[in-house]
Amino acid sequence: MKRYLITGSSGFVGSRLLRLLNNTECEISLLLRKINLNYETTVCSLGRDKIPLSALKSVDTVFHLAGFAHDLNNPSKVEKIYQSVNVDATVELAELAVQSGVKKFIFVSSVKAGGGALSGECMTEIDQSSPDGVYGRTKREAEIKLLEIGRKSNMHVSIIRPALVYGPNAKGNLNLMLSGIELGWFPPLPEVGNRRSMIHVDDLVRAIFFVA
């Protein structure tokens, strides 16, 4: 029976992945800031605490979804937190996974790691431009380092770059916009031809599991 370790299982996408895994024949362990009494949990705050090697014991596949995405209240501290959580902790986890003999490491990154679309066209896997913000830059840096770890080991590294994720209980700007529309805050706007790529959270978690 396969054993999976999930980081970020309390988040929007991670909680749906956990629900999907509950319906499969597998063993599940979690890496979280707070204990989950329903699962074997290693309590660890990524970017602040050292990750225990024991968290990777007997794990076949790691689903790494945890990351730092927003902090509008403390801009002076943002850069350091992004680096420590999105890059340093990701690399630390992957290196421990290699030590523990983990076979697959699945990193849920972001479409922002690929930078903006080139010449207004849809992006593909081979399109790469410079990420605009610190979030995209740190996700890209983590991707590069993970691929290098994968090349130097027997652990297979997969990277998924989701576009904007929507679905029940979604957080972030999309949810704020939809709430504003429902409350009548947004007047009707003329057609301007803007398009935005999106993916439903359940489609995303099925894709994540398919990669495993």
List PLM regions with ranges.
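NAD(P)H-binding glycine-rich loop region in Rossmannoid oxidoreductase-like domains
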Residues: L46-D88, E92, L96-Q99, A113-G114
